[in-house]
């Protein structure tokens, strides 16, 4: 479970998130809201990429202030632009990087890399320059890079925003088939209809917290 206890976050004097208190237990959670409302900042707090000014974020009881490395193994993060997650130019090397960094054995690295590439039909590109992949393939590579670490939670920041319709469907299907707890920041409301819970952010606060059939129409009314 993810717990947010009286969390406030600010950039300098500008308060981005205000006194948030939440428990996130559901398997599929969506975060929506207008640009600048604090949703992406909130997502980064959940895996320790950012640390709150006040309050605490707990992941299965571990505090992001003191257990950052352990939490980043438990909570994977897929960025909006998959180019931001490409570390090495060759696909196979890029997938192996995180595991090598954490001391995984060569056999484990080889096995998990092959499984991840096979899952999304990327095996033929294992020695391919990563930057030459299509947008959809890059996003699937980014998802693979998180999956090889075997996290318990995966956070996606606008995973379909930069993709055409065909690749949006492909990436959405990949996310839908994940066994991990998934938290998605998105403007793609159709994609979120099957989720368990939707948090609507406005001005640094959660103003709606409900199932999609209630939260999404309320958000649409707010935007009118």
UniProtKB/Swiss-Prot annotation:
GO terms for cellular component: ATP-binding cassette (ABC) transporter complex
* Gene3D superfamilies assigned: P-loop containing nucleotide triphosphate hydrolases
Named from the GO MF annotations, one term is: ATPase-coupled transmembrane transporter activity
Q: Which UniProt keywords apply?
A: ATP-binding, Cell inner membrane, Cell membrane, Membrane, Nucleotide-binding, Translocase, Transport
Checking InterPro entries in the record gives: AAA+_ATPase, ABC_transporter-like_ATP-bd, ABC_transporter-like_CS, ABC_transpr_CbiO/EcfA_su, ECF_ABC_transporter_ATP-bd, P-loop_NTPase
Membrane topology is: Peripheral membrane protein
Alphabetical list of SUPFAM superfamilies matching this protein: P-loop containing nucleoside triphosphate hydrolases
E.C. designation(s): 7.-.-.-
Domain ABC transporter positions: 2-224
**Family designation:** Belongs to the ABC transporter superfamily.
Q: Which organism is it from?
A: Photorhabdus laumondii subsp. laumondii (strain DSM 15139 / CIP 105565 / TT01) (Photorhabdus luminescens subsp. laumondii)
Mind telling me which SMART domains this protein's record contains?
A: AAA
Which EC class is the enzyme in? translocase
- Summarize where ATP binds, as residue positions: 33-40
**What is the first-listed, main subcellular location in coarse terms?**
membrane
Protein's UniProt name: Putative ABC transporter ATP-binding protein plu3849
Q: Tell me where it resides.
A: Cell inner membrane
Functional summary from the UniProt entry: Probably part of an ABC transporter complex. Responsible for energy coupling to the transport system.
Q: Which PROSITE patterns match?
A: ABC_TRANSPORTER_1, ABC_TRANSPORTER_2
């Amino acid at each position: 479970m993810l717990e947010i206890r009286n969390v406030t976050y600010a950039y300098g004097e500008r308060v981005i998130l205000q006194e948030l208190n939440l428990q996130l237990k559901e398997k599929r959670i969506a975060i929506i809201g207008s640009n600048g409302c604090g949703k992406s900042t909130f997502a980064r707090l959940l895996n320790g990429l950012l640390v709150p000014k006040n309050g605490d974020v707990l992941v299965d009881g571990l505090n992001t202030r003191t257990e950052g490395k352990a939490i980043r193994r438990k909570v994977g993060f897929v960025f909006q632009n998959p180019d931001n997650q490409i570390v090495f130019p060759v696909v196979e090397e890029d997938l192996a990087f995180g595991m090598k960094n954490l001391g995984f054995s060569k056999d484990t690295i080889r096995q998990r890399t092959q499984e991840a590439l096979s899952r999304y039909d990327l095996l033929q590109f294992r020695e391919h320059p990563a930057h030459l992949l299509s947008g959809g393939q890059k996003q699937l590579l980014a998802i693979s890079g998180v999956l090889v670490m075997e996290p318990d939670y995966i956070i996606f920041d606008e995973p379909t925003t930069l993709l055409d319709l065909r690749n949006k469907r492909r990436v959405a299907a990949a996310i839908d088939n994940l066994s991990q707890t998934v938290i998605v920041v998105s403007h793609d409301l159709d994609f979120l209809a099957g989720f368990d819970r939707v948090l609507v952010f406005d001005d640094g606060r959660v103003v709606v917290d409900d199932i999609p059939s209630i939260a999404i129409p309320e958000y649409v009314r707010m935007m009118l």
